[in-house]
Amino acid sequence: RFFDFEDFHMADTLAPWIESGQLMVMSIDTLDKETWSDTNGDPYWRIRRYEQWLHYIVDEAVPKLRYLSKERNGWDDLPGVIAFGCSLGATHAVNLYLRWPDIFCGCLALSGIYTAHYGFGDYMDELVYMNSPVDYMRNFPEDHPYMELYRNQKAVICCGQGAWEQPDTTWMLKRIFEAKNIPVWVDLWGHDVKHDWDWWYKQAVYYMPYILE
């Protein structure tokens, strides 16, 4: 939920960059209970509801963020928009970044799963495919104009290998990016690194300077 970044103190973790004027954070609610997490629901309806949410982010939330950066922070313009999330939020962050690299100049994704099979099982249609990064990036054409954006922007995908982590699709993306010469930093942390906030704080602090430099 949108309040998790504050309630679980991720906002406090990012405070040095916020207070120094390098970072502005907008935490946006998801529709996970209606979409990815409602595994007993109609997948045809759920994926279309998810697509509506993505377009809300791109068409409404990002323009609102640009407005707020001027109204609240006095910035002339946003230097860039980074998609950031943990767990299923990381899944959304990677999907947003890869689908709209002309809007999102970077990505920080911690402990996500990057195939739509996680939420939609064996159901497949065009929209499910479009929201399954392992699938669409595996077949992504070399001559697509987004390739230049991917190769000139900064994205980090990180996953631990300890309790409750599911790193398999992170490994898949790593191999796909390497084969396509896309310099996403895909980083697998150790077997002691679990799927929980205490590790996400450490990872955010570790990667944020790279993302912002």
Q: Where on the chain are the PLM-derived regions?
A:
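Non-catalytic cap/lid and distal C-terminal segments of serine-dependent acyl enzymes
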Residues: 1-213
